[in-house]
Each structure stands twice: as structure tokens, then as C-alpha cells.
Amino acid sequence: VLVEEYLTSVISSEMSATSSLALLKAHAIISRSWLLNKLYNKKLSLQQSEFRTFTEDGTEKFTRWQDHLDHIDFDVCADDHCQRYQGITKVSSPAVAEAIKETYGKVLFFDGKICDARFYKACGGVTEYFENCWEEVHHPYLVPVKDNLDDQAIPNLTDEKECEKWLLSAPKSFCNTTDKAVLSEVLNNYD
């Protein structure tokens, strides 16, 4: 499947194909960046033989992150582990086709490299460092940020009491909405 055809399905599978054009275009660029970063890093890691065994106290074990190395016979999977892909026959929309066309070839770069543009569908009001969720690699562009525009500082979520207070609250955030119009614009009817 060609990259742009793949992205048409990904965007229509991960979010509503009737979302605003601006949102669809942003999703196209993010998803294309993630995909091309994965393909490049998979090729690089296979060339560098990253399949290693490690010995710890005389016990042999195989250590790796669940990532692009999980897929030997194909590039990416069709579920949320990679990007939700429901096939090229997935119902799309003219707006998705327009978003793909208008962003053709556009990707996110940082320091001369295509960004690992992973994102999440669930939100607790603040993001986390990449290395705390995925693999022990620091990306300066994937650090904690609040999911709102107020001026309050991010609480120290490494402090148990602060974290408990945060988790038991309903933090003000863009994703903490019950507005049915907003939800229907961004979510498919099965999310």
C-alpha cells in the first residue's frame, strides 16, 4: 500500500473522516511523520543488528521495546500499537482526500530528523516524557505539557500526594469535554 493511501485509511480509522479540514491536515502530517520515522528507524536498526541478547547474572534474556522490531514480515500493524488502519476500503471522505493532497510529503522535523510523532487518544490533562512511556530515548520535543491554555504550572506528579490529587480531580483540559458536537467531530462512532 502506498504511503498516501495508507494515511487516508489511518486518518479515517483513527478519527472521524468528517472532522474539520485543519484537524485532518494536522493528523495527516503527524501520522506521516510517525510512519516515515518508523520505516527509517526499522531499516536502520535492522542494518545495525539490534536484535541482541543480554546476560544478567548468568541468565540469558532478550530485551526489546514493543515497537517497530515487533514486525519482521511487515512494516507496521493495523491496530493502535502502530496506527489504526482498517484497510483501503475504509469509508473516507472528500475532506480526508483533500487533507492528504494538501499536505503531501509534509512531515515534522527536529534537529534535521523526522520526528517520532507518537500521540495518544486518552488524556489526563498533561503529557509525559517520551522515555517514560515508550523507550529510553529522550526527544526534546516530547516532554510534559499541559493540555490547556491556563497559566498554572504542571503539578509535580512524581510526588504521591500531588499525583493522587491530580488523578482524583477533573483537570481542566481540551480533552476533558462532554460537548457532543466536539466529540462527534473528532471521534468515530465506535470510539
Name these PLM-found stretches.
Residues V1-D191:
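Conserved, single-site charged/polar hotspot
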